[in-house]
Every structure is written in structure tokens, then in C-alpha cells.
Amino acid sequence: MKPDCDLLIIGGGINGCGIARDAAGRGLSVCLAEMNDIGSATSASSTKLFHGGLRYLEYFELRLVREALIEREVLLRAMPHISWPMRFVLPHHRSMRFDMTTPTSRLLNVVMPWMRGRRPAWLIRLGLFLYDNLGGRKILPGTSRLDLRSAPEGRGLNPKFEKAFEYSDCWVEDSRLVVLNARDAEARGARIMPRTKVTGAEVVDGLWHVTLQEGDQSRTITAKMVVNAAGPWVGDVLRGTLKSNSQSGVRLVRGSHIVTKRLFDHDKCYFFQGTDGRIIFAIPYETDFTLIGTTDMDHTDADVKPQITPEEQSYLIDFINGYLAKPISDADVVWTYSGVRPLYDDGASSASAATRDYVIKTDTSRGAPALSVFGGKITTYRRLAETALEQIAHHFDGVDKVWTAGVPLPGGDFPVDGVDALVTGLKRDFPFLTDRWALRLVRAYGTEAAQMLDGAKTLADLGTDFGATLTAREVTWLMDKEYARTAQDVVWRRSKLGLRMDAAEIDRLQGWMKDHAQQSNAAAAE
């Protein structure tokens, strides 16, 4: 019996979509089922950084940090529209302390007990030297020192912070990263099925028979192999749906963020160290806002929607107020979001200490292979996919070689420093666009922005204006090409325009999308 596909991937987050893209590009037939919107769970709720993970050096996770540092620049070249370099300012004060549970702090307590848990400047310099050199940096500038008493980055900070270090990492639009991987997988032959839940799986004559539920419709497809990339639900799928006896576990860790009005008058980020040894970031966000996070809290149930608790919000506010000249309060918070990280359960004593590295395990006990993905960072998703394919390849004939390094995602076929030129060209071809609107479109769609606007001579040609520069032309593109079905998909995942739209505008958008979907379905049925 010929199966419907080689791989059935469960989960449409960054790991599932990354594996789907890689596998489809190697000639495998791929189906991917995601029970909700593409990239709507963990992958939509990160701190939105492509970074090596400076703090992971304290846990001696050198392999993870090196791999992530190398990947920063590989990914930057492949998606310069949704990812870009940023400089991070790390203020230092003699009161800085280690998290006393880290391997580094335990070692120093033995060899240098007089330090009493302090995090000295020389040790930060050493860590940043490693950070600059572990990954063979080629594009990003290296570490420098700042005098906060005279540098603009010192304005807005408590004057007790006089010195700082500055290093490089990258921003990424996480939700768009997932969608673009799904689109590219589909362009290479994969079948992407959002809002389709896997409700059962059994092995018959060496093939997986997987039951899918979409709305009130149920069907079964067959596959040679199942890939369990269900994120927070990976354990449930492994032992429930796939009926595996594997003891591999997942630790659910909730990370919460707050968004305030813009706190600083420059475009650099801050890496703030707490007196408890933890760190948070303060990052320029959507031009007019500042993103602050994250927390690390154990989360008991993947089916319980993650939401910031009052204690987490107070923690983030108190933490950043230790650095600000002008404190903020709950009244300054305009939005919050939380996500659950499905970390491999390595028995760590705290959520912060749990490894961020990925673990991939294959089980053949049911009579057909199933691969499960635990953990991972958004920065290493492409390497995770390559590693998964290394484990998958011997189950199939004629699997092509690795190929994804540096291959652009949709809209990313332009130089890393080419955004300004694209914005200029877009404004020339569509003169009704403002500077800010054109930049938003380029940052979202890259070279495809012109394709989306093709034929428009005036603003009216873009159709209904929903507010915040969102028009019917763009929404139609998102529905036709990017799997969007609801207003929430559009304003909180494909974009962050929900920060600039009120409830009435979002309701109007939802009504329009419902009508448009009905009209499209009726036309397709004729």
C-alpha cells in the first residue's frame, strides 16, 4: 500500500514548520497538521530574538551557544526583512549577583569564596569575549564599552549605573518566521493543514494511520513516519496519541512579557541583570513601545492558556524599576503576552536552570517510526530540522542533502542592508504610502510587498481601510497566502497592529474576513 505521505508532522510551530520545509526540499512528501493557527502557541510568544543566549554560558552550555551564534548570521542572511541586527547595552554595578544555582557560581564559590556571589566586570568581559568569538562572527559588530555618564544610552537610567558593555544579537518577527517556513514548505510540495487536530494514530502493516479532525469533518491519512513536534503537547501526543512507552519528559515553563509605551529615545536594547541573578530584556518594539521580559515559571498543564499573573507583572515592573530613573507602574502596561516553553526535562532544580537545548528521539516500538522533538530555541530551529532529517533519512530512499543554510524565505531575497532601498522603491512605485507604512510592509513582506500592492494606483485601490494602515488588499493576501482566518490571526500574529487598533476596528475586520471567506468558498464551489 502506498502511503499518502512520507512524513506526517504533528504541530505547526517553528520546529514543525522548519522540519516540513527542510524535508519537502529534500524530496520527501510531507503533511503537517496544526490544531490551531500556524505558529499560534509557543512560537508566537518568544522574546523575539535570534541570539546565542549569553546567560547560558553560566550553565556551560557551550555547544548550544556556539550553534546559536553561528545560526544568527545564517538566518539573518535568509530573512533580512523579518530579522535585523540590534545592539544590547548591559549596564554593570558592583551589586550584581549570580544566580547561586548556576555551575559558574558554584565553581567560583569554591575557588574564589571571597567574591560572595558577586558578578564582577572582569567575568562579564570574559563571557562577552567568548560570545564574540565562539560563533565565527562575520556580520555583527563585536563588544564595546560605554560610559553611561555621557553616552545617550545612559539617559533614562538610574545614575548609579555609570559603566556598561555593548554587544550584538538579532531581532526576529517570530510569528512571521513560522508562517514563512510553512509557506516555503508548501511551495516545495508540503501539504499544510491548519486548524486540523490529530485525534488518533495506529500502525497497520508498517504504516501509520492517522485520524485528522477539521471542524466537524474527520478523515484518515497514512504515513511512513510520524514527527511529533507538538511543542507543549509533545508528551501528550507521545504517550496518548502515539501510545509510546517512552519515559522522555517535557518541562513546561511559562515566560511572560509586558509591553509599555516607549521608555527610551534610541533603538538599542538593554540586558538587565537582577540582584537575584536573573536577567530581563528591554527591547524597542513596534516603533512606539518597549517590550520587557521574560519570567521563568513552571506551568502545570499545556491545555491551560498561559497568562501573566499579577506576581509576574509586579516582578517585571520592580525588576526594571531598579534600572530606571523614572519608575513605571501597572498603568504604563499597554499589553501583555505569555507563552509556554516545552523544555526537555533534565531534572534541573529551577525553571531558569532547565536546558534550552533540543533533544530528538526516535521510537520504532509500534512497528513504524515516530520521531519526537523536545525543547529547542527559536534561533536553532533550522539546525534542529537538519538534525531531525539526519535521524529520518535512513528510513527513506534517495533523500537529498542539506540545503536550507542561507536559502531565503519568501520575501527575503535581498541583501542584509537592503531594507532602505526596498522602502525607497516601494514608495516610488506606490506614492500614496507614507514612510512608516512602507517600512512596515517591507519589514513584513520584503520583496513580496510590491507583489501584494501590484496594480494599485491610489489608496482607494487597496479596498476597505480597517485602521492602522491595514487594508483589504493586505488582509486578502494574508487569507489567501498565509493561512489567516480570524482577526486575531491578522492583528496579533501576522502583524502586531492590535497595538494600534481598537476593539470596534478589530470587530469590523472580523466581520469582513467572515464575509470574504464565505464569498471565496461559494466561488470555489461553483
Positions of the model-derived regions?
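N-terminal Rossmann-fold NAD(P) dinucleotide-binding loop
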Residues: 16
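Beta1/beta-strand and adjacent pyrophosphate-binding region of the FAD-binding site
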Residues: 2-13
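Core beta-strand elements of the Rossmann-like FAD/NAD(P) dinucleotide-binding domain
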Residues: 3-5, 216-225
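A conserved short coil-to-beta-strand element within the FAD-binding core of flavoproteins
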Residues: 194-208
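Glycine-rich active-site loop/strand segments that organize a redox cofactor
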Residues: 39-66
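Glycine-rich FAD pyrophosphate-binding loop
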Residues: 24-44
